[in-house]
Amino acid sequence: MKAFDDINAELENDWTWRFAELVRLENIYKFVEENSKIVVRKAQILLLYSHFEGYTKFAFLYYIIAINESNTKIKNLTSMLKAAAMHNVFREYKNLNKTGKYFPKGLPNETELKECSRRLEFVERFHLFLDDIASIPDEISDTQSNLKPEVLYKILFQL
């Protein structure tokens, strides 16, 4: 796994250039004519939000990359990170159109039976998934181009 100092340095580097842009715009504001200050202030607000979202997205993505590069088995992660690492497995098992062990030649028409067979297959293979190397998909940190509180909460909950 990446060393704490390396992770901290990457986060600090990203924050530094973003903060420098905000300071530059604040310095420009001081020299703008009074009748144009509102335009610069609006630009500052937009840039501030943009950097807030960008930094948040970068930090979460960097966290995911650090976990993925650590080559840690899923069984050694916290429960929440186990769920995140198994994101694609869960998606696969939600697919009721996929044939499986119990209905290899075709699926029954009954949805409840399809769900039951998919769940049973998952339970039978669960212990095998735990020995896989964790690979959390980037989409877990998707800010949906709008970092409203619900989106931030969702990402924090998943990681």
PLM ranges: what are they?
Residues 50-54:
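Extended alpha-helical coiled-coil scaffold domains characteristic of the BAR superfamily
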Residues 1-46, 61-63, 69-70, 74-84:
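Charged alpha-helical initiation segments
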Residues 48, 60-159:
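Helix-loop junctions and short alpha-helical segments
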